[in-house]
């Protein structure tokens, strides 16, 4: 019978509570990130003589947080045969809470902890379900009379706190199927000032991750690689040298691939200018300087033209509103009805609205001399949404409907029954979608990938966006990176911001009776209350805008 010795190790992050205010609006603190000074962390150190098996494993786990010199300190805890061949980033399992070390009589130590997420060999992260557990057996062996780890699994295990300290996220950028808008594909890399430019380019040239399969393309001709397996950075200039295969790209694709490179490298603070070479000569891109600024390609940004005013409802009528003025729309058809919520496309030539009883959904396309309308019937329609492809989305009871090019398009979601879908909110790039779904844990916020053809839309690879949050009632995209959502786990309801690049949530404020949020970068944020009034966020304060409800912006 095996005997177990129990050791507890604290490698965890302490959650921060909210900051109460006197008013009904309450500011909050970051949840899931690592505030400065909130962790007492063991500094990575080399193994010492006489360490017990559990001390060796504990030291290895702590040393795994340091990626300096290719995890040099962590490698010293391994048997000599493994030190040079261990590939720590083949898979990274991220745990949280308290880890337990159980020492057995068979020269092994079993480590268990709640599993937060897994980072695969291509640096993409997947969040785990709340009840997931990490169980890892470390086999040990005597080397010169000292215990060392005989690792028989790939990758490493690291606490969430140490992950946040030692790693960071970067977006790779890939064009959608129209080659007009770039979409982010998030990777997790060790914090480094020297090697990440090279690693980002290697990952970019390998193409998008599994989560974007079928939804995005790459502008690089097949076979394009780095001609020099390094991206040097000097005085703010990054030089990317590609092989001659890239010369087969037509002029427009050279623009797109340049945008992919420049936007991907722009996340590195030291890089301000990018030069793209073929061998040692500059790649010729039409109407583009040889030295490309990191702000050059804004025309490919999914947020570049989100400038239209919000629409809101007052006494059943549709109003257009901004900070200065609120005015009724000029449309005889819609002015004759009574409406629950409305939305428009970015060019404001497609208007859609849900009737006040939430049983009918009308989409009017005014791009031609005679407007064309599509009518959909259902129950419990929610607030409609538009996307960058001029598709209009609405979710009802057991129903997800999309109108595109004056036709109703069939929508399916992999792995989720429609009766469990509360709402679907397309992203500004039109490639991703937020989903509010009923799960065994409550109402959760998830994210999926939109794959389109002429006849149908599929939402695939649905995954968790945030680790916690089981009472989500509404969500909106503020920009291609940031999502705002309402959680009514307790009153007053909490309003959170989540960074889709990192998964970090921040509690912004709380407000009694919160029902609907509308927010776009550089535009006012609107909050609908249950009493039928609307608040606008202005210079850090909430200002009442009167009896208006259900504000929306074009997607």
List PLM regions with ranges:
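Positively charged n-region of N-terminal signal peptides that target proteins for export
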Residues: 1-4
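Hydrophobic helical h-region of N-terminal Sec-dependent signal peptides
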Residues: 6-10
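C-terminal motif of bacterial Sec signal peptides marking the signal peptidase cleavage site
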Residues: 12-15
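Bimodal "functional hotspot" detector
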Residues: 17-555
């Amino acid at each position: 019978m095996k005997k177990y010795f129990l050791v507890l190790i604290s490698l965890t992050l302490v959650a921060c509570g909210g900051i109460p205010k006197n008013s009904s609006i309450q500011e909050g603190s970051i949840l899931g990130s690592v505030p400065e000074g909130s962790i007492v962390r063991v500094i990575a150190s080399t193994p010492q003589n006489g360490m017990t098996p559990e001390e060796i494993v504990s030291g290895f786990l702590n040393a795994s947080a340091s990626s300096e010199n290719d995890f040099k300190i962590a490698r010293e805890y391994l048997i000599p045969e493994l030190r040079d061949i261990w590939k720590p980033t083949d898979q990274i399992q991220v745990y949280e809470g308290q880890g337990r070390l159980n020492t057995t009589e068979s020269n092994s130590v079993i480590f268990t902890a709640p599993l937060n997420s897994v980072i695969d060999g291509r640096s993409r992260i997947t969040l785990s379900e709340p009840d997931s557990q990490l169980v890892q057996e470390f086999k040990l062996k005597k080397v010169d009379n000292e215990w060392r780890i005989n690792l028989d699994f790939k990758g490493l295990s690291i606490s969430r706190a140490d992950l946040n300290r030692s790693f960071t996220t970067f977006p790779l950028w890939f064009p959608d199927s129209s080659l007009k808008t770039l979409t982010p594909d998030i990777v997790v890399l060790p914090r480094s000032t020297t090697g990440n430019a090279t690693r980002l380019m290697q990952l970019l040239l390998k193409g998008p991750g599994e989560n974007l399969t079928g939804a995005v393309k790459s502008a690089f001709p097949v076979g394009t690689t780095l001609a020099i397996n390094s991206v040097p950075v000097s005085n703010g200039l990054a030089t990317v040298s590609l092989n001659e295969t890239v010369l087969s790209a037509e002029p427009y694709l050279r623009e797109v691939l340049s945008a992919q490179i420049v936007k991907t490298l722009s996340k590195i603070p030291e890089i301000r200018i990018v030069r793209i070479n073929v061998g040692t000569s500059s790649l010729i891109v039409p109407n583009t300087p040889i030295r490309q600024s990191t702000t050059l390609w804004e025309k490919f940004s999914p947020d570049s033209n989100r400038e239209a005013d919000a629409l809101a409802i007052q006494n059943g009528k549709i109003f257009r509103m901004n900070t200065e003025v609120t005015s009724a729309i000029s449309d005889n058809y819609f002015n004759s009805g009574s409406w629950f919520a409305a939305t428009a496309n970015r060019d404001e030539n497609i208007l859609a609205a849900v009737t006040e009883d939430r049983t009918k959904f009308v989409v009017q396309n005014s791009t031609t001399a005679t407007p064309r309308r599509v009518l959909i019937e259902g129950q419990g329609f929610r607030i409609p949404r538009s996307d960058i492809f001029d598709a209009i989305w609405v979710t009802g009871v057991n129903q997800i409907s999309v109108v595109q090019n004056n036709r109703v398009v069939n929508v399916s979601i992999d792995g989720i029954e429609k009766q469990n879908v509360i709402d679907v909110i397309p992203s500004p790039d039109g490639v991703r979608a937020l989903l509010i779904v009923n799960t065994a844990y409550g109402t959760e916020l998830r994210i999926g990938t939109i794959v389109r053809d002429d006849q149908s839309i599929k939402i695939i690879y649905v995954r968790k966006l945030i680790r916690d949050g089981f009472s989500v009632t509404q969500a909106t995209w503020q920009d291609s990176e940031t999502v705002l959502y309402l959680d009514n786990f307790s009153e007053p309801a909490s309003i959170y911001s989540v960074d889709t690049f990192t998964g970090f949530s921040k509690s912004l404020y709380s407000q009694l009776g919160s029902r609907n949020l509308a927010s776009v970068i550089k535009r006012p944020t609107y909050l609908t209350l249950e009493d039928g009034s609307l608040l606008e966020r202005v210079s850090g304060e909430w200002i009442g805008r009167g009896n208006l409800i259900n504000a929306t912006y074009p997607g």
